[in-house]
């Protein structure tokens, strides 16, 4: 391996270590992620020709067109990253609008219970199925906002939020539109909607239920319900009950509509999110105009122009840094080589290969890992590598559920980390092993079903 490649890997690993020890260093993870981005790509530019020849063998421009080619590559990765960032910003803004204007108040009434454990199961089930319809990122944002209405104790809320991460990733794994990796495999024709739902549903349920059973032992007693409910209702009294419900259904219903919009128009999901944001923004402006408050400060605090300042930009910048740093690893061939090496070491055992890929997906972004697998392994007419074969279905499960093992291993984890201020160390100490147990149990259940039930 070239010295330059090793240097890029060292920068990534060092940055990852600093992110993991944020609670000790007190340096914001977004700052480290941005330095990782710049460091990796700067080293890449020391000698980009070797990587162009490796990853883009069709390039024939020579040294003269090298800079232009690399610029195009970076812009392509930035474009892919930007779609995620705009989706995230749009989803966070939509949920903030719904929350601040009282849209979640009635949901709180439905979910309300005094039992901590009863709430845990309600949260787990709702998150699991909502994630199959929405994506795990949007689902996590919605559920955290609901949790804030129900749970005042931050320690308890960290436990619930951790289960939200696990349930969101598990729910997204069995749905063709629930996770970006299943969308990739589905669009490529490697899995079918009916196949992945039928065969991955039970393993996904197992990977959620077992962690929930363990996590409920961390919750005892009854919830202390927020005393400020009357004040909260007063705070959102700008809108009538009907208007609040309209805001809720425009927001959450719009999020559910995004996959439908994508399937109809074939436009990226962030376009659908921006459509929903535009419609919801317009509706709230019309509602506020009807209040005749003009420039009165009290009546304008919850308008979208004010709420935009509440979007957590550090989370956005963290995503930017991580995704662009990982894209550099993809461009130097590390991820592809890693996948090929796994196949050789484990002699084509697809349970082990996909299992390891799932563990790796908790460390690096699962999108380039899955993309690398799609490029490495050809589709066969029959057997494990056929459409809906063991390899592709396990890849969908492992890449999705495996991200729960570390809090920065999935989009859901990263956004919950930012919203609830959960540290990497706390999650790794208290939750990682629980997520790993559920992950393994899901794989075992899949093996049992394929080996014994399908053999009947």
Briefly describe each language-model feature range.
Residues 40-51, 78-79, 130-167, 171, ...:
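Membrane-interfacial helix-loop connectors
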Residues 9, 34-35, 85, 120-125, ...:
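Hydrophobic alpha-helical transmembrane segments
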Residues 60, 79, 101, 108-110, ...:
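Transmembrane helical segments that form the transport core of multi-pass membrane transport proteins
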Residues 79-89, 195-213, 265-278, 352, ...:
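Alpha-helical transmembrane segments
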Residues 6-15, 26-62, 81-93, 244-254, ...:
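Hydrophobic mid-bilayer segments of alpha-helices in multi-pass membrane transport proteins
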Residues 1-4, 24-27, 55-59, 67-84, ...:
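Interfacial loop-to-helix junctions that mark the boundaries of transmembrane helices
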Residues 4-7, 153-154, 158, 174-175, ...:
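Juxtamembrane and boundary regions of transmembrane helices in multi-pass small-molecule transporters
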Residues 43-76, 92-109, 129-141, 328, ...:
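Transmembrane alpha-helix boundary signature
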